[in-house]
Amino acid sequence: MEGDAPVAAAAHYQPASPPRDACVYNSCYCEENIWKLCEYIKNHDQYPLEECYAVFISNERKMIPIWKQQARPGDGPVIWDYHVVLLHVSSGGQSFIYDLDTVLPFPCPFDTYVEDAFKSDEDIHPQFRRKFRVIRADSYLKNFASDRSHMKDSSGNWREPPPSYPCIETGDSKMNLNDFISMDPEVGWGAVYSLPEFVHRFSSQNY
């Protein structure tokens, strides 16, 4: 990371979202939190929706380390089965990550987030390496559906309290979350990247 460029960019950047504590948030429903954030951006014409993407992070084993998460204070990572963040590629050339579960700034300059939360694949066993499904926000709003059944145990009890608003569904589906979590490029919407590919595609710096 070179100098204070991300800090300088952040200083001139107007967030696309309300403050973190004013965002729609339900613990362990990151896919819906980001859907609601996309909806907010669509309804408040501050930035073109086409500058924004939902980013699903997972892998074949559904075991991905992410650092700087509120669920794990200190220096260690959380091992999620999947996680979802919002990526804003601003017309000013700087990208920002919106992660409602991080202890990093909200929003956070892309390069800062990658360095602190993802670190490097070189230091991670291959089975834990992250992949990224990047979906345009308009496509995510149009196509995502979840009946929240993945958050119920075998007895039908909620593992975590569900959001108070109705389930998100489309005319075609009530539940397609697994198509977004899947890192099979032949499935679902958007494009799938490795971490180096993701950084190369969206970083403002030459890694």
Curated annotation (Swiss-Prot):
Short name of one Pfam family for this protein?
Nt_Gln_amidase
Q: GO CC terms on record?
A: cytosol; nucleus
- Reaction catalysed? N-terminal L-glutaminyl-[protein] + H2O = N-terminal L-glutamyl-[protein] + NH4(+)
Q: Supply one GO molecular-function term.
A: protein-N-terminal asparagine amidohydrolase activity
The active site annotation covers: C30, H83, D99
Where does the UniProt entry say this protein principally localizes? cytoplasm
Which Gene3D superfamilies has this protein been placed in?
Protein N-terminal glutamine amidohydrolase, alpha beta roll
Q: Which keywords belong to this entry?
A: Cytoplasm, Hydrolase, Nucleus
Localization of this protein: Cytoplasm, Cytosol; Nucleus
Please give the biological process terms from Gene Ontology that the record holds.
Answer: protein modification process
Give the PANTHER family listed for this entry.
PROTEIN N-TERMINAL GLUTAMINE AMIDOHYDROLASE
Task of the protein: Mediates the side-chain deamidation of N-terminal glutamine residues to glutamate, an important step in N-end rule pathway of protein degradation. Conversion of the resulting N-terminal glutamine to glutamate renders the protein susceptible to arginylation, polyubiquitination and degradation as specified by the N-end rule. Does not act on substrates with internal or C-terminal glutamine and does not act on non-glutamine residues in any position. Does not deaminate acetylated N-terminal glutamine.
- Self-association and partners: Monomer.
Q: What is this protein called?
A: Protein N-terminal glutamine amidohydrolase
Source species of the chain = Bos taurus (Bovine)
For this protein's source organism, the top of the classification is: Eukaryota, Metazoa, Chordata, Craniata, Vertebrata
